[in-house]
Amino acid sequence: MIFTNRHIIQEKVEPIPVKKRPTILVLGAGYGGLATVVNLQKSLGVDDAEIILINKNDYHYESTWLHEAAAGTLKPEQVRYPISRVIQQDKVKFVKAEVEAIDVKAKMVTSSAGQHTYDYLVIGLGFEGETFGIPGLDKYALSIANVKAARQIREHIEYQFATWSLEEVKADSRLTIIVGGAGFTGIEFLGELGDRIPELCEEFDVPADKVKVLCVEAAPMVLPGFDPELVEYAVRQLKSKGIEFSIGTPVVEATPEGVKLKTGDEEFEFIEAGTVVWAAGVRGNRLIEETGIENMRARVKVEKDLRAPGFDDVFIVGDCALMINEEINRPFPPTAQIAMQQGDMCANNLIALMKGQPTQAFVPDLKGSIASLGSNDAIGVAFGKKMTGKKASFMKKMVDNRALYLIGGAGLTFKKGKFDLL
């Protein structure tokens, strides 16, 4: 450096190193992915990280409400909201695209919009229906997979009622609805159908005794994991709405005319049906199977901090993550409650890694589980107490509203929430 009486001249200027912002790439805007993004944007400044969210739709849908949209008791528009409503666009770049491939070794994701590199990856791609290789199910059964599928089921059922009312030679099998699966989704869908069928009968002048709704379940029980007393209540309530059950009866084939059931060791029965809805199993997204990460039915048994085994820069949340409840040595169920909590912890652990701090183990805070049986009935356990009827239904709607509030605040809750509480 040379000093003069008028100037200070710096002969050589060393460049100031610029710290590169880490890129956090989040795949999927379901409960887990969106909770991760919302919590990241709350905690990080614009210059702290580049956050990219990729989702095939520009909206998020409440997957725990899809059974209502499928039955026709809730409009599909009520189930979804724009992603732009809940992300800060100066902090989060949203890419509407279909994820096509994930290369965790090259740290590269390929989508319909191009290629995306990352420093940290969060996989929250949600679930797919599992048909267990049963012939015909993929082709002839409907599945409550997303908003579009729910709309399809609603319109299909309405079409069957409308066609029956117009045709000269009545095909009563049009009015038979078979629901495969007596788990959470199947039972909640049956509850909504029990409310919706009388409305359809009145709208299309269909005698109620012409309609048949049958739930078939391969397992020997309804709602596995629920208290037997609550299960008994649920079955009784659904039967009072005209729902029939065939438990311990697996579906072995689906055709355009209906389903074939195994009713004994060498005994089978074919039931004609105008509508078959499959709600008997889910799996993680198939892209998981192509990553090279060890998985079971596209679900990864994640480390305690939600990272994929062997990949310190990859987190997995929601339906694609498998965690074992060590108290009962069984996986935690893939619920919205757990997915949102995983999103919170995932965001916290990402920030910890960026700061060079240790990550934390994820421990689910299970507040309970409630299954609806229609608009004003439900069963469940909340805060250690069993409940049924309108009280349980009230709690169910409060849980649904809370999920909206945690992501989008009071504004989103008032716009999309459920307030028909009594």
Language model: regions and residue ranges:
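FAD-binding core/adjacent interface of flavoenzyme oxidoreductases
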Residues: 2-21, 92-176, 180, 266, ...
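C-terminal auxiliary extensions adjacent to catalytic cores
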Residues: 12, 375-422
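Beta1-alpha1 glycine-rich phosphate/pyrophosphate-binding loop at the start
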Residues: 2-93, 177, 187-225, 277
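Internal hydrophobic alpha-helix adjacent to the cofactor/substrate pocket in enzyme cavities
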Residues: 195-198, 337-364
